[in-house]
């Protein structure tokens, strides 16, 4: 008897509730994407003054497109602790604002010099370079404005911890530090340990912050977050290996962005250092490890498990 593919089984299974709504993985992805678009639409209303193009640029980058994986991780983790939907939505929007700001700046001529992102022109192509820089700056600021607002959580200590954790994830010991290492990789040969550290910072830090945000909203004490942190760590590395494979083997029309950039730039990646088969094997092992970290949560963590499997199967 033929068996269903892992992709089909993960996506058709009834996953646990996202803020009280029982959803399949596909439905959860769609629901969170719509919620994040709604949040950005409210936060980025276009003013009738000279700042209008700045807001249009932010909306161009932030609304529509993208996997919304980081926001989904916030929702799925917060749901373990019955966090109110609006609290999860605001924290998830802040995480996505940081991610989108990083994409805007990453696409600039001084960085990756990309023309397409999420299937549409990059912000500096649609507007201009100065507007793109400022749009990224504003989304960066917006993230912390949202987290610091009492509407995100009534407890000021929860809000402070959210701000602190995201600041660390986005700064020189996280995403920005990983980005400068990625630039150095164009002229310096990195070994596997250095590439792993680079990707833990550039990609993994924000994925970890997304899971951490859900735990913070749920007021889970730090000593209770060991399993979730292990899940996020392994998921982040698996995500990057899958991204390296997608960059080398994917379809640009489906991915909505330019591919094979790392090979052209001569950068060492998990794929170049391990080869395709070992890289796939490593990604599968990391996903299995990530799922194992969730053993204490039972069926309530099925959505997080499905997200881990989805990371290996995505095509964009």
Specify the residue positions occupied by each region the protein language model found.
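N-terminal amphipathic/basic leader segments beginning at the initiator methionine
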Residues: 2-44
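Mg2+-dependent prenyl diphosphate-binding active-site environment of isoprenoid biosynthetic enzymes
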Residues: 31-35, 44, 48-292, 299-312
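Local alpha-helix boundary/kink/capping signal
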Residues: 8-12, 77, 296
